[in-house]
């Protein structure tokens, strides 16, 4: 994925979501519909533009201290509007899941920490990113792990390759072998399953200008935390086939491996 999102405590009100009346679900100024709530394109643009402007100023200030002039490419924040929508919708759905499944969510990443790390201090993007990752880490730890199919394992592998977390070229058998002992694969798949369930329940619809809805996921590696995006809704508002949840036991059984 790209260097981006993280940070902790924006309320639903701070998301500036709009109440949806009895209208259709294809307005061009709406980025996404989540149940009876809409997220406007203007809102997505405003969050992105604030983060971009703040990042450019941070880069200029750092370069000035060294007597340098940054290039236009260096001034560009590696976060796009798709990333913003992923956060807005992910937080909405994640809160519903945590409440419904009684999953505890703790403050683990602060807006201040993320804002400083990414060069976007005091921005709504930093707040949203931290809030999402607190939710993500809570859901990943608190939901029952899910089993992967070859197709869903391939989707996860493709996301890791795209983020330069895994090398390209693994065969299906190699993917099975490499992921066999990796607990995170079943954990992130559990988050995907829960999000897919909410998408279907709430009739989530995405504006065609956004290619997908993705999970901004974290992975602990030997070189530190890495980030990657795992799609769970395609650009037509359809749930993707990412994983299959394990059935919940009706009688006490041995706990599932995590």
Language-model features: locations:
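A C-terminal, polar beta->alpha supersecondary segment
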Residues: 148-258
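Well-structured core secondary-structure elements of compact alpha/beta domains
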Residues: 45-80, 123-147, 154-189
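N-terminal targeting/tethering segments
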Residues: 26-130
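Solvent-exposed, non-transmembrane alpha-helical starts
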Residues: 106-107, 146-150
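N-terminal export and membrane-targeting signals
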Residues: 1-14, 81-82
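C-terminal motif of bacterial Sec signal peptides marking the signal peptidase cleavage site
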Residues: 18-22
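Exposed boundary/loop context
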Residues: 14-16, 29
């Amino acid at each position: 994925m790209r260097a981006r999102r993280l940070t902790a405590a924006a309320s639903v009100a701070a998301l500036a979501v709009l109440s949806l009346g009895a209208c259709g679900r294809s307005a061009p100024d709406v980025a996404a519909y989540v149940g009876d709530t809409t997220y406007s394109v203007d809102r997505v643009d405003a969050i992105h533009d604030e983060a971009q402007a703040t990042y450019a100023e941070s880069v200029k200030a750092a370069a000035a201290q060294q007597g340098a002039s940054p290039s236009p490419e260096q001034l560009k924040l590696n976060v796009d509007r798709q990333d913003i929508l992923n956060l807005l919708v992910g937080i909405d759905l994640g809160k519903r899941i945590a409440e419904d499944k009684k999953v505890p969510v703790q403050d683990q990443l602060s807006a201040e920490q993320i804002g400083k790390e990414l060069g976007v201090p005091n921005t709504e993007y930093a707040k949203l990113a931290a809030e999402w990752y607190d939710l993500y880490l809570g859901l990943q730890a608190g939901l029952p792990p899910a089993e992967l199919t070859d197709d869903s394992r391939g989707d996860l592998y493709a996301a890791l390759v795209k983020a330069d977390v895994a090398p390209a070229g693994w065969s299906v058998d190699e993917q099975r072998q490499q992921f066999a002992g990796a607990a995170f694969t079943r954990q992130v798949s559990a988050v995907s399953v829960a999000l897919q369930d909410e998408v279907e329940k709430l009739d989530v619809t995405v504006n065609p200008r956004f290619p997908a809805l993705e999970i901004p996921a974290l992975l602990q590696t030997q070189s530190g935390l890495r980030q990657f995006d795992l799609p769970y809704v395609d650009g037509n508002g359809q749930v993707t086939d990412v994983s299959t949840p394990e059935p919940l036991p009706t009688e006490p059984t041995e706990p599932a491996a995590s």
